[in-house]
Regions:
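Non-heme Fe(II)/2-oxoglutarate
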Residues: 1-53
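Conserved short histidine dyad/triad with adjacent acidic residue
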Residues: 63-82
Length: 152
């Protein structure tokens, strides 16, 4: 069963669609998708976040909607993109009862918060509210991660 079956998403930025195929999720340079022209409000959020975290490379940008009462089942994200970038969770609409969980932590964020999170460990989401939960995931290679990678 698909762990994300209760969720719908809009990819705003990711690998160029011309690269669609077996290696689509391999190492790539992300590009903006045309949908960005319809939701330009995303841009200042993303670029302000890049500046705030000393971002040096912008990866995927994903907007997700989890229906009221919906769940994203426990899972670990894998692959190049999941391992390469730092992940930032930006709740856009997150009513009381919509929680983001890891084995050792549960958060119930407010709209407008920003949380850095690891998606390469077990995590899940429960929307126990009466409205859709809408969030943006921004993937950024930070200066701190680059320095850490160089020290290995």
């Amino acid at each position: 069963t698909d762990v994300h079956s209760d969720m719908t998403d809009i990819w705003v930025r990711y690998n160029h669609i011309d690269n669609l195929g077996e290696h689509f999720n391999d190492s790539h340079e992300s590009v903006w998708y045309p949908i960005i022209e319809r939701i330009p409000e995303v841009l200042p959020i993303v670029f302000d976040l890049m500046a705030a975290v000393s971002g040096e490379r912008l990866g995927g940008v994903l907007i997700t909607k989890l229906k009221a009462g919906g769940k994203i089942l426990p899972h670990i994200d894998r692959g190049w993109h999941a391992g390469y970038y730092d992940k930032f969770f930006v709740p856009i609409q997150n009513d009381k009862g919509a929680i983001f969980c890891w084995d050792d932590q549960v958060i119930e964020p407010d709209a407008g918060d920003i949380w850095q999170f690891n998606n390469d460990v077990n995590h899940w989401v429960e929307n126990n509210s009466n409205r859709d939960r809408i969030a943006m995931i921004v993937c950024i290679k930070t200066f701190e991660r680059s320095i850490s990678d160089c020290r290995r």
